[in-house]
């Protein structure tokens, strides 16, 4: 009988064993949290670049039906004009392409998260930027994405000389 009661007591975990398991899970979670946070940030940066690429494609669709001409607007107005000029392609449910997914705040109806060209599309050089994130879109310590006339999008760090150069070639 004594052996049977000893077996019954040994079936569960002790409090110390449970606490050790909880501590180990806590340590693993604290190690994974920064990795997950960074992965989510990178996903938003990629979504932001995708939005810029979609805006370029929208402009190309507009130009196809207007003898190769893009809207004559400059700066942020270029992106807003595409929204007005090609309404079936960018209705309210697709208006999300007008802002960067990294932004923590909502934009107004006449705002975008991107800068536009200081001149009309036809006057932009082949290697000049067509658009870019507004400063701070990716946080104060990061640069942003730049959209080029050929439709490619590149990411630049804040201290990269090209980021500073492109920022001055685009209007807010």
Across the structure, where does each feature detected by a protein language model lie?
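Acidic-and-aromatic substrate-binding clefts and catalytic sites of carbohydrate-active enzymes
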Residues: 74-80, 105-108, 137
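Conserved hydrophobic/amphipathic alpha-helical signal-anchor segments
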Residues: 30, 34-97, 152-153, 162-171
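Short, flexible active-site-adjacent loop segments at beta-strand->alpha-helix junctions, enriched
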Residues: 61, 103-106, 135, 152
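N-terminal single-pass transmembrane signal-anchor helix
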Residues: 9-40
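C-terminal accessory segments of extracellular proteins
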Residues: 2, 124-172
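N-terminal leader/signal peptides at the extreme start of proteins
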Residues: 1-13, 172
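Short beta-strand segments
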Residues: 72-74, 97-102, 130-133, 147-148
């Amino acid at each position: 009988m004594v052996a049977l009661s000893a077996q019954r007591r040994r079936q569960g975990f002790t409090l110390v064993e449970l606490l050790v398991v909880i501590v180990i899970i806590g340590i693993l979670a604290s190690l994974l949290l920064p990795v997950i946070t960074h992965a989510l940030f990178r996903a938003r940066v990629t979504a932001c670049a995708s939005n810029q690429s979609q805006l370029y494609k929208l402009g190309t669709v507009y130009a196809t039906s207007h003898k190769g001409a893009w809207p004559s607007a400059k700066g942020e107005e270029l992106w807003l004009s595409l929204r007005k000029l090609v309404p079936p392609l960018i209705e309210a449910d697709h208006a999300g392409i007008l802002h960067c997914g990294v932004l923590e705040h909502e934009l107004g109806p006449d705002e975008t998260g991107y800068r536009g060209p200081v001149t009309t599309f036809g006057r932009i050089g082949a290697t000049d930027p067509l658009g870019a994130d507004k400063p701070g879109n990716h946080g104060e310590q990061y640069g942003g994405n730049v959209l080029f006339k050929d439709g490619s999008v590149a990411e630049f760090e804040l201290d990269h000389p090209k980021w500073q150069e492109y920022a001055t070639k685009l209007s807010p």
